Each structure stands twice: as C-alpha cells, then as structure tokens.
Regions:
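Glycine-biased, small-residue-rich flexible motifs in mid-sequence functional cores and linkers
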Residues: 1-210
Length: 210
C-alpha cells in the first residue's frame, strides 16, 4: 500500500527496542534522516520505539521509508494501533506499507518474527539503534549476519546509556566485531561500506532473499 517506487532505492533496516532511551530516540531519528537524505529507503516494522524513530526520521527530511507489517494492509488491522496515524502518514508522504498477509489478518507472534527477518531481507544493511542482548531485534540482526550484509550498531557515550540494559546488545555486537560502531561523524563511511557490499552481491543471490 503506497509508493512501490521506493523499492528502487537501496534499503537500510532501522531496528531496535520498543523502549529506547531519550538519546536512543534522538539517535534513531538522526541516523534515519541522514541516510534518507543520502537517498536510502529506511525500512522498519512500524513498532513502538526504535522502529517509529526510523520512519519519523526519514519522513522529517522528505525521504523514503517502508514499513513491513505483521498484519493485513487495511487500517483496521494495523498493529500497533498507536501507530495508525504514522502508517497513514507514510502512505500520504509516498512511502510504502508491505505485508505478506491478507486484508483483515490481525497481528500474531509468528508474524512479528517473520517481519523482523523480512526487514533485513529487503535491506542492504541494518542499523541497530538500541537493543538488549536478547529480544526480537536479534531476529533481524541474525538474518543480517547470516546474509553477510553490513551491520551497524549505534555507539553511545553517556553512562546513562552505556549502563542501560537496552544498550548492552549494541555494545556486545561491536565488541564481538559482528557490527560496525555507528557514530554521527561516520555516516559517510557507513555509506561507503554499504555501497561496497551492494556491488559485491550477486543479483541472483539477492533475489532469493525475497
């Protein structure tokens, strides 16, 4: 539902906890906006929290965003209900809502897991805004790692953030060298990594992800 042309742009999945810190909200909007301004399609799942910051950051700069849903595309089925207005804004501003499910299908747990993996499948890179060591975000993280696409985790400096349970996943991924640390000064470097990875992906292999 919406503008299919956004799929012509390289996708970047923006994911994370439903309970980001204050700086996590700011970071999600900032990085999504910066990538959107550089021509990327910001892909997320319309969830409360980090997903919302991804969509909002892209929309705020007039950029492209796609929401993968775990429910039907009709307004009555939108989940969560708190983001119904955001879903409508995405369509009005020429973004896109995508779903595997028929009209009238409500959200189920399996649908949420599948949605998380599909976000990574549609994208050429994944940005983790904030995540704990365990949680739903890891479905998309693992899908990104398995498909050998670039994974970025936002780096935080304040004690308030680095001591927060919802940031420990970011710290662990960078420490284990599974993700690049994403800083506000490193967006262009991140774009270079993404472009290089995109060029190395065989088109036939990429099609098999959908």
């Amino acid at each position: 539902r919406g503008n299919l042309d956004v799929l012509k742009k390289l996708g970047i999945a923006v994911i994370g906890t439903r309970e980001p810190t204050r700086n996590g909200i700011l970071a999600g909007k900032h990085f999504s906006g910066e990538f959107a301004k550089r021509g990327y399609n910001i892909v997320s799942g319309l969830a409360i929290g980090c997903d919302t910051t991804g969509h909002q950051g892209a929309l705020a700069v007039g950029g492209a965003t796609t929401a993968f849903l775990a429910n039907g595309l009709d307004w009555d089925s939108i989940y969560p209900k708190e983001n119904l207005d955001l879903a409508k804004e995405i369509v009005v501003k020429r973004g896109l809502l995508l779903s595997e499910y028929p009209v009238g299908q409500s959200c189920g747990r399996y649908g949420l897991v599948a949605r998380d993996r599909l976000q990574a499948g549609l994208s050429y890179a994944t940005v983790v805004v904030q995540t704990g060591v365990k949680g739903g975000t890891m479905h998309a993280v693992n899908a990104t790692i398995q498909s050998k696409k670039p994974l970025f985790a936002v780096e935080y400096k304040t004690d308030e953030d680095t001591s927060n349970e919802k940031v420990q996943g970011n710290i662990k991924l960078v420490k284990e060298q599974k993700a690049y640390a994403l800083r506000s000064t490193g967006i262009d470097d991140a774009c270079s990594i993404i472009e290089k990875a995109h060029k190395s992906i065989n088109p036939v292999q990429q099609q098999s992800l959908f």
